[in-house]
A protein has these predicted regions:
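C-terminal motif of bacterial Sec signal peptides marking the signal peptidase cleavage site
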Residues: 13-16
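Low-complexity, Ser/Thr/Pro/Gly-rich disordered linker/stalk regions
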Residues: 25-129, 133-137, 143-152, 212, ...
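Sec-dependent signal peptide recognition
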Residues: 2-8
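Short tryptophan-centered beta-strand motifs in secreted/extracellular beta-sheet-rich domains
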Residues: 112-114, 185-193, 198-202
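Extracellular/lumenal carbohydrate-interaction signature centered on repeated Trp-anchored short motifs
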Residues: 101-111, 177-185, 192, 225
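Bacterial signal peptide processing site
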Residues: 18-20
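Aromatic sugar-binding interfaces of carbohydrate-active proteins
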Residues: 181, 197-262
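Glycine-aromatic-enriched beta-strand/loop faces of beta-sandwich-type recognition domains
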Residues: 136-185, 237
Length: 262
């Protein structure tokens, strides 16, 4: 009888220990999963101008545009809330890491305004700095661009407005170029989307004062502009993946992005 009593006690203790161990393991695993999620989120998203953005980070893979390497370390928001996009050379690998973010939210008709700090008019001919709408998976359609780029040729204009059609041949895109010469490190860029047109206007300084405006343009009547809500992208990258001709790293600072619906 005593033997049976002791066996029962031992069995109960064993079950209790297993429950404690299971509970402990579950807590640790849960904590690790939560930590993992937070770590992933910390490097894959960023909060800027009241919007959550995804960060393009492909590790050792090269993808377009370019193709290029893309790294989360090339993107950050400072204590003032300003967004930094930096083209950086990795000293360990010799790779140039590019920067891109895109909004989780989609935006439709209305005005899109970016306040920039830096000299995008003085970028190396192999660099591209873009502010744009883009529909992933439908390259050549549903895209509205402001791009600072000479496309690898130092003799070409450095400022580009481009609107891709909602349908049809991408080669029918509407595009205008301009030789940009800023008068300082602050500038503002805007496009407005409606169901019929896309209109552009840019400004010296962080203002939309008409006296500071330059290079206004509008798509022609009948051009098939996108009518879809689209994410907003900002990127800094190398044309065809070619290193800067001057070998210099570059940083662009975006003070704000604002969308005003219409």
């Amino acid at each position: 009888m005593k033997n049976m009593y002791f066996i029962a006690i031992i069995a109960m203790l064993a079950i209790s220990c297993k429950k404690d161990q299971a509970s402990g393991n579950t807590a640790v695993n849960s904590g690790e999963q939560e930590l993992g999620k937070k770590s992933v989120n910390a490097v894959s998203t960023i909060f800027f101008s009241g919007i959550t953005w995804n960060i393009k980070d492909l590790g050792n893979k090269t993808v377009g545009p370019g193709p290029n390497y893309w790294a989360a370390s090339s993107v950050w928001v400072d204590t003032q809330g300003f967004l930094h996009l930096r083209l950086k050379k990795d000293p360990a690998t010799g790779r140039w890491n590019c920067a891109e973010i895109y909004s989780q939210q989609k935006f439709g008709y209305g005005s899109y305004v970016w306040e920039i700090e830096g000299r995008p008019d003085q970028l190396d001919p192999n660099l591209v700095f873009g502010l744009f709408n883009y529909k992933d998976g439908d390259d050549g359609h549903h895209e509205v661009d402001i791009e600072f780029a000479r496309w690898g040729n130092s003799q070409w204009p450095n400022f580009n407005y481009t609107v891709y059609p909602a349908y049809g041949d991408p080669e029918t895109r509407y595009s205008k170029t301009y030789e940009l010469a800023l008068n300082g490190t602050y500038s503002t860029y805007k496009f407005t989307r409606t169901s019929q047109i896309v209109s552009y206007k840019s400004y010296h300084g962080h203002t939309q004062n008409e006296a500071n405006s330059f290079y206004a343009d509008t798509t022609p009547t009948g051009f098939p502009v996108s009518t879809e809500a689209l994410p907003v992208h900002l990127n800094l990258w190398l044309f065809r993946g070619n290193a800067p001709t001057n070998g210099q790293e570059v940083e662009m600072i975006v003070h704000s992005f604002k969308f005003t619906p219409q």
